[in-house]
C-alpha cells in the first residue's frame, strides 16, 4: 500500500487521475484509475447527509449535512434556523429549522462561510409539513341486524392514509382514500358488536380521532322450532289451531296445503 498526500491539490473535483508503477527493469503496469474526489480546503464543500423527512408532521424538522470546513451557516429560501455554526473537519452538522407553517417547501438552502470564503448553496430536499390529522365521518352504517358475517361499512376521510382497526372488528382493507371508503370486516362470529372503531393515519403520521362503528348484531343461525300442540285429528273444525315454539321472533312462512292469517312468530 502506498499513500501519497504530500503534493497539495487546489480546490475542485478530480475525476481523471490515474496511477501506474514501473518496476526496476522498466515494466510498467496498466493505469489504475483513482475514483473521483472533491477537495474543499479553502472553499467549503457541502453534502447532504440526512434529508428532512417527507412528508413530516414535525414543524421544526432536522437536517444534517457535511462540510469540509467549519464556519458560519447561512440560510436561504423559506427556511431559517438558530443553528449558525458548522463544525466541519470531517464531522456532520445537524440543524433544526425554526417553526414552519404547514405547506410545501422546495426553495430552502444552506451554505457555509469559512474564513470569509462562502460555499456554494446546498439545496435542502423538498418536503411537506403536515400537522393536520384526518377527519372521519360515517356514511353507511353496518345493518343493525345482519346475517352476513362479513358486513360492509362506509366512511368518509378528508385525507388518504392507513386504516387502523380497534375493538373486536378487523379488516384486510388497510388503505383509505380522500373520499368515501367502503371496508369489509373479516368474518365475525354471531354476537352483538358495540366496541368497533377505526382511525386513519395519514402519510405524515397524523392520526385521526376514533370513528365509532354503530352497534350491530351478527346472526347467521336460523330459528329453531318445536311442536307444542298438534291439530286434533280427526276434527270437525275447519279452522283448527296449531301451536309451536320458536326461539326467535320472525315472519311465518306457510307451505303445503295450509295457510293462516298469522304472519309473525313472537
Q: Can you annotate each of these PLM segments?
A:
Residues 59-63, 149-153, 238-242:
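Structural beta-strand segments of beta-rich domains
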Residues 26, 30-44, 124-134, 213-226:
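Flexible, low-complexity linkers/stalks enriched in Thr/Pro that connect modular domains
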Amino acid at each position: 500500500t502506498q499513500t501519497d498526500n504530500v503534493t497539495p491539490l487546489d480546490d475542485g473535483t478530480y475525476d481523471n487521475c490515474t496511477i501506474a508503477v514501473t518496476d526496476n527493469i522498466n515494466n510498467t503496469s496498466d493505469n489504475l484509475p483513482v475514483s473521483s474526489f472533491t477537495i474543499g480546503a479553502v472553499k467549503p464543500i457541502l453534502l447532504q447527509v440526512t434529508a428532512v423527512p417527507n412528508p413530516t408532521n414535525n414543524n421544526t424538522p432536522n437536517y444534517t449535512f457535511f462540510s469540509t470546513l467549519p464556519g458560519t451557516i447561512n440560510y436561504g429560501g423559506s427556511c431559517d434556523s438558530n443553528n449558525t455554526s458548522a463544525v466541519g473537519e470531517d464531522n456532520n452538522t445537524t440543524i433544526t429549522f425554526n417553526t414552519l407553517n404547514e405547506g410545501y417547501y422546495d426553495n430552502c438552502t444552506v451554505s457555509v462561510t469559512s474564513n470569509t470564503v462562502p460555499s456554494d448553496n446546498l439545496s435542502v430536499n423538498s418536503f411537506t409539513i403536515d400537522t393536520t390529522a384526518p377527519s372521519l365521518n360515517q356514511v353507511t352504517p353496518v345493518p343493525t341486524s345482519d346475517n352476513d358475517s362479513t358486513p360492509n361499512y362506509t366512511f368518509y376521510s378528508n385525507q388518504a392514509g392507513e386504516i387502523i382497526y380497534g375493538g373486536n372488528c378487523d379488516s384486510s382493507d388497510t388503505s383509505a382514500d380522500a373520499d368515501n371508503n367502503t371496508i369489509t370486516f373479516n368474518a365475525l362470529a354471531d354476537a352483538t358488536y358495540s366496541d368497533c372503531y377505526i382511525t386513519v393515519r395519514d402519510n405524515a403520521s397524523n392520526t385521526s380521532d376514533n370513528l365509532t362503528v354503530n352497534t350491530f348484531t351478527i346472526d347467521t343461525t336460523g330459528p329453531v322450532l318445536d311442536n307444542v300442540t298438534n291439530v286434533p285429528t280427526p276434527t270437525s273444525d275447519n279452522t283448527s289451531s296449531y301451536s309451536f315454539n320458536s326461539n326467535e321472533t320472525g315472519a311465518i312462512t306457510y307451505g303445503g296445503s295450509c295457510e293462516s292469517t298469522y304472519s309473525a312468530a313472537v
